[in-house]
Amino acid sequence: MRIFSFLFLLLLGILTGQGLVSGTDNGKTTDVTWDKYSLSVKGQRLFVFSGEFHYQRLPVPELWLDVFQKLRANGFNAISVYFFWSFHSASEGEFDFENGAHDIQRLFDYAKEAGLYVIARAGPYCNAETSAGGFALWAANGQMGNERTSDEAYYEKWRPWILEVGKIIAKNQITNGGPVILNQHENELTETTYDPNHTLVVYMKQIAQVFEEAGIVVPSSHNEKGMRGVSWSTDYHNVGGAVNIYGLDSYPGGLSCTNPNSGFRLVRTYYQWFQNYSSTQPSYMPEFEGGWFQPWGGSFYDTCATELSPEFPDVYYKNNIGSRVTLHSIYMTYGGTNWGHSAAPVVYTSYDYAAPLRETREIRDKLKQTKLIGLFTRVSTDLLKTYMEGNGTGYTSDSSIYTWSLRNPDTNAGFYVLAHSTSSARDVTTFSLNATTSAGAISIPDIELNGRQSKIIVTDYNFGTNSTLLFSSAEVLTYANLDVNVLVFYLNVGQKGTFALKDEPKLAFQTYGNSNVTTSESSYGTQYSYTQGEGVTAVKFSNGVLAYLLDKESAWNFFAPPTTSSPQVAPNEHILVQGPYLVRGASINHGTVEITGDNANTTSIEVYTGNSQVKKVKWNGKTIETRKTAYGSLIGTVPGAEDVKIRLPSLDSWKAQDTLPEIQPDYDDSTWTVCNKTTSVNAIAPLSLPVLYSGDYGYHAGTKVYRGRFDGRNVTGANVTVQNGAAAGWAAWVNGQYAGGSAGSPSLAATSAVLTFNGLSLKDRDNVLTVVTDYTGHDQNSVRPKGTQNPRGILGATLTGGGNFTSWRIQGNAGGEKNIDPVRGPMNEGGLYGERMGWHLPGYKVPKSASKSSPLDGVSGAEGRFYTTTFKLKLDKDLDVPIGLQLGAPEGTKAVVQVFMNGYQFGHYLPHTGPQSLFPFPPGVINNRGENTLAISMWALTDAGAKLDKVELVAYGKYRSGFDFNQDWGYLQPGWKDRSQYA
């Protein structure tokens, strides 16, 4: 009986330790379960290392796989994804999940192909600095009543969206062989009252019900909006509406683009927060700061050195690990572009976000540093079940060092997370750590933190059969169980590393590289010490263990490509590669290891497969010459693109046409929409009648053109108030004569002006006031007074000096809510004449009557022009060369400029506001091998006129790539069709 009990307990320990885990489930599936330590997928614990990705902000589906491969290569095993209602629904009852980037099935397929799980976040409200927070724009005009409550009017609008998108999510759940493991309900919705009948509780119940109706069975989650409330946790005042996995969002950096000494203050109360409010659940951060957005008039992302610094992930993400977080999602990991009119007014065209992966899809040092954490968590299974042993400044020989001490109760593995107690400190501090190990108390010597640096020191760390690291002052990057157990350490150059292997006698070893290893004896065995030299050092021990000692720069170029497509990668399911810029994947076939990747410059490559049958290395399909090292790796050279000359065409053959013919008094607007409403569903009353809110007439995104008529020569002016978002300007003309307006302000959503008609020619009858308005997006929910319902367009227009307007008409994007360009979608275009006529689309034939002027010539007064040109590119097929357009304007220029590449609005340039003047285009929007149609619209906000002084194509980095960036993108670039009905 005792033997049976022992075997039973042993089996139970295996099932609940490193093997299969039984945890709490939601009663719908056991494929995804949880306990207070971590999430488990298919019975195996998982450290969820996730990155936020918004497919809408990269409208080329093929490039989603490019991004996913880069995330997987850099240690991620999941993506978190918003699904924006606004992107898929141009009008009520219509949903597009088929055309171009609207085909989200491809998103799930690519995620699965890349080996990434998916956390689905379909709202219905998302926020995300996107227009109206992701609400369909046709609904964001007041008709939903009290949004984000149980209001019946709101329910009737959002329910069809969640049902439709939910069915696709359900189809792709892990229970159906797909990648979806979690499904978020709503977004940052603070539970204000713990009352089962409260409207928010009822609303969350409604969301759960509709998702269930759609077929969702994976666990539900939610994201708390910082430490401001406690919402929807089953462990705290659960009166209904609670989700399975509680999450806490946090953006603690407080960093400044212009002041490198500001912020950098760690939050060290996450652990207590989760213990208080979600103690039976794993600690989950659905959004942790991966960067920060920048507003109109702010800084451009490339200048934000503090946000871009690799110090940030090193210190902040490791602090989260020390706080026992085991579900960690970085917002953003790839930001992308607010192309078209998809941005909320708080951001400009770029949504780079200072994220680890640049808007151009280039890998920043920030991502390289993040990879070191991702690869560590991927193999460190003991980290998935720990308790907080303690924390504070008493663990080291220097009280300026703060320590988190985590312990695995089953294996005794220890994880000590170290950082300066004052997290913003830049001191170089050397100290020893008082650690608890299976060999007793050990003082681990010569640990150095170089300013804003953090380290995870491990003890009793198993890295394979009969291989345990008793301790190490060098950080573990990863390990592999191949023909031998391979352990990978990293340190800064010049820092000291000391480690000991558990239960091992003094081992003979051979060193290959610049780091000299010495030994010393102690009560717990042999201690191996070294000072990290430059580059890579390999140490081969007589017991078979192979250790790589990497400096940080070498670690940044170290990869562990999996040989499995599963997001869960065991230590025997990856190989080790050092050297290139990117390793996308690897496989072993018939004695050859085949590696795909990218390289900027020619580099060496070292490959360790642990397979003696592997004699050759192929890089992007081509065999490279290699030599075998004494410790079993293969070393060769892979080519880069440093010698490639990128020759971009000059843009000197332009045609121009008038894009504001509506300012002329005899313009025929008889087919325009008549503004005749005297009431609005919007809760905000207009300042005058008729209602001139653009949304009330079916025009939502982009430029709007209004024409108001009045009689009499005695009218002295007009008082006009326009609200189209922060920085949005407007201009007005009377009978074709400039009358004034506003250049907009980054701090104002609405601007007013008293237009003076003195000196302007008026008629007895039928004078025309033309008002052209820019647009920077619909507000998010948090903006007063009514969030997404804050109207767009003219809030009020009255005449001074007597009389009233006799009529108003409005024109916006061609077709309004008809979505006449379903590939590019409902937010791509506005109401400028050139847009309505499709002058920006490929295949448009410019008439001979067009002038041969360019944006450098500009306009001399308050006018508008639409400039078009074509050019060809012929980049090498194996190159990834991000291309952008650099604009500039003379100081003092006040104008609204838009950039269209092959029909996509990929730039909104306000030279008087900034900050953005460089606009990148992803392949698929631009043709790297073929013809391109470039259009620029420009209208002056004052009678001083406007012109540009720089319009040139620029190349970013150059990379030899194993990814096909030069495909036929024709299906994403539908061409011109006659649009004369929208004049």
UniProtKB/Swiss-Prot annotation:
Location of this chain's protein in the cell: Secreted
Secretion signal span: 1-23
Molecular function GO terms recorded: beta-galactosidase activity
UniProt binding sites for substrate: Y82, N127, A128, E129, N187, Y251, Y353
EC number: 3.2.1.23
Claim: Signal is one of the keywords in the record: yes
GO biological process: polysaccharide catabolic process
InterPro entries the record matches: Betagal_dom2, Betagal_dom2_sf, BetaGal_dom3, BetaGal_dom3_sf, BetaGal_jelly_roll_dom, Galactose-bd-like_sf, Gly_Hdrlase_35_cat, Glycoside_Hdrlase_35
Protein name: Probable beta-galactosidase C
SS bonds (residue pairs): C257-C304
Residues carrying a glycan: N197, N276, N391, N434, N466, N516, N601, N676, N714, N719, N804
Active-site feature positions: E188 (proton donor), E287 (nucleophile)
Record has Nucleotide-binding as a keyword: no
Similarity field: Belongs to the glycosyl hydrolase 35 family.
Enzyme class: hydrolase
GO cellular component: extracellular region
Task of the protein: Cleaves beta-linked terminal galactosyl residues from gangliosides, glycoproteins, and glycosaminoglycans.
Catalytic activity: Hydrolysis of terminal non-reducing beta-D-galactose residues in beta-D-galactosides
Keyword terms, alphabetized: Carbohydrate metabolism, Disulfide bond, Glycoprotein, Glycosidase, Hydrolase, Polysaccharide degradation, Secreted, Signal
